[in-house]
Swiss-Prot record:
InterPro entries referenced in this protein's UniProt entry, alphabetically: Ribosomal_uL3, Ribosomal_uL3_bac/org-type, Ribosomal_uL3_CS, Transl_B-barrel_sf
Recorded family membership: Belongs to the universal ribosomal protein uL3 family.
HAMAP family referenced in this protein's UniProt entry, alphabetically: Ribosomal_uL3_B
Pfam families: Ribosomal_L3
GO MF: rRNA binding; structural constituent of ribosome
Gene Ontology CC terms: cytosolic large ribosomal subunit
Keyword annotations of the record: Ribonucleoprotein, Ribosomal protein, RNA-binding, rRNA-binding
Function statement: One of the primary rRNA binding proteins, it binds directly near the 3'-end of the 23S rRNA, where it nucleates assembly of the 50S subunit.
Lineage: Bacteria, Bacillati, Actinomycetota, Actinomycetes, Mycobacteriales
Protein name in UniProt: Large ribosomal subunit protein uL3
Record GO biological process: translation
Signal sequence coordinates: none
Subunit-structure text: Part of the 50S ribosomal subunit. Forms a cluster with proteins L14 and L19.
């Protein structure tokens, strides 16, 4: 496999802990149980217009899988899985085949990764919680507007509220990618990745771990 080839795997965020590095300094890490995944389909430039592998992850009761999905997994010769995603690549013909397992051993020489997950949903939140506004005065003439937004624009000019003005609204539950996180350790025996810092999502949430796009993946 090419050293610069994008590598990716699905996993579950287990939570955060702290470990010690070679200089005996405390390092906060997020533990991700990654894989094992299985390759269920290969996309090629000739047939699909782009190169990618489709990987599946997670156990699921076969009775909860519809017929098209069951047929897709059966064609690949694998048992049904809960999650399916595609990882774009430059060339997959020589590196992967349908039915092949994808494990954390793939990241043995990787130093930095990008992690994608779904952030915690907070529901409908006010401007102070959602955007960190300071709020208004607690007394001295303030009438029930302590946590309100305040001014949202002028009257005659422009005579409207600009699009994108920060207000109250639905907070969280967004797809977020955190880039260039240091991959602290790969535990192949337990299928664990120890990633320095925090990654998006709640404990038990699905995450996608890929080699860092903005360089430094193998530095």
């Amino acid at each position: 496999m090419s050293e610069n080839q994008i590598k990716g795997i699905l996993g579950t965020k287990l939570g955060m802990t702290q470990v010690f590095d070679e200089d005996n300094r405390v390092v906060p890490v997020t533990v991700v149980e990654a894989g094992p995944c299985v390759v269920t389909q290969i996309r090629t430039e000739e047939k699909d217009g782009y190169s990618a592998i489709q990987i599946a992850y997670g156990d699921i009761d076969p009775r909860k899988v519809n017929k098209p999905q069951s047929g897709h997994f059966a064609k690949a010769g694998v048992t049904p899985r809960r999650y399916v995603t595609e990882i774009r690549m430059d060339d997959v013909l020589s590196d992967y085949e349908v039915g092949q397992d994808v494990t954390v051993e793939l990241f043995g020489d990787v130093k930095f990764v990008d992690v994608t997950g779904t952030t915690r949903g907070h529901g409908f939140a006010g401007a102070m919680k959602r955007h960190g506004f300071a709020g208004q005065g607690a007394a001295h003439g303030n009438q029930a507007a302590h946590r309100r937004v305040g001014g949202i624009g002028a009257c005659a000019t422009p005579g409207r509220v600009f699009k994108g003005t920060r207000m109250a609204g639905r907070m969280g539950n967004n797809r977020v990618t955190t880039q260039n996180l240091k991959l602290f350790k790969v535990d192949a025996d337990s299928n664990l990745l120890l990633i320095k810092g925090a990654v998006p999502g709640i404990r038990g949430g699905l995450v996608t771990v890929k080699t860092a796009v903005k360089g430094g993946a193998h530095a």
